């Protein structure tokens, strides 16, 4: 479902035939145009946002490169909040529950989304995970996206704000190399 990497351009992608104007009289060409790739994602994202709003939950999408420190930042934030706000976390990773286990060890509910080969979370994944969390009484839901500086920027998950984390060892040129990600940050 990516505009950036094309990871969903398989048989499920919606395509519409488009007849191009012939460049040579009497010859025609057919070009496939991909339509509304993110339309269903955006619909589910709007539903997620309504759900968060109805429960008074602020949803934050945390994005960065793999290993930049998203989970460490969440652990430090949870400790700093010291119970003043009720929080929960949705963790996105290609494999393992390692990060979700770290968050649970902080005493916070966490749901793991294991994406397999998908390089980002989408709204339906978040929707499904939300049903495993106690939204009633929550103040903040952190969504830790899959570590990737390309694809996550294109997907509305229903979050209220996007946070992009940049680690010093990555180099200071990441915003120039991955402008969509840093423009998506609030």
Where on the chain are the PLM-derived regions?
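Long, basic/Gly/Ser/Thr-rich N-terminal segments
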Residues: 1-23
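Hydrophobic positions on the alpha1 helix immediately C-terminal to the Walker A/P-loop
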Residues: 73
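Short glycine-rich anion-binding loops that position phosphate/pyrophosphate groups of nucleotides
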Residues: 10, 64-65, 146-148, 168-171
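Hydrophobic anchor at the beta1->P-loop junction of P-loop NTPases
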Residues: 60-62
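Nucleotide-state-sensitive switch-loop elements of NTP-binding domains
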Residues: 16, 20-50, 54-57, 68, ...
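Hydrophobic residues at beta-strand termini and immediately following loops
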Residues: 5, 113, 165
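Inter-motif core of Ras-like GTPase G domains
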Residues: 137, 145, 152-170, 176-186
């Amino acid at each position: 479902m990516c505009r950036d990497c094309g990871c969903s351009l398989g048989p499920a992608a919606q395509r519409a035939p488009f007849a191009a104007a012939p460049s040579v009289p009497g010859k025609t060409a057919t070009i496939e145009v991909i339509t509304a790739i993110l339309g269903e994602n955006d619909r589910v994202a709007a539903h997620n946002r309504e759900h968060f709003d109805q429960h008074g939950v602020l949803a934050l999408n945390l994005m960065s490169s793999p290993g930049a420190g998203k989970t460490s930042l969440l652990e430090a934030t949870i400790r700093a909040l010291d119970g003043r706000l009720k929080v929960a976390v949705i963790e996105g990773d290609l494999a393992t529950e390692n990060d979700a286990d770290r968050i649970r060890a902080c005493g916070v509910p966490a749901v793991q989304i294991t994406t397999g080969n998908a390089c980002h979370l989408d709204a339906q994944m978040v929707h499904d995970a939300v049903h495993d969390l106690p939204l009633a009484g929550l103040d903040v839901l952190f969504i830790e996206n899959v570590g990737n500086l390309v694809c996550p920027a294109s997907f509305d998950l229903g979050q209220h704000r996007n946070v992009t984390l940049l680690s010093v060892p990555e180099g200071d040129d990441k915003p120039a190399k991955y402008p969509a990600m840093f423009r998506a940050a609030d």
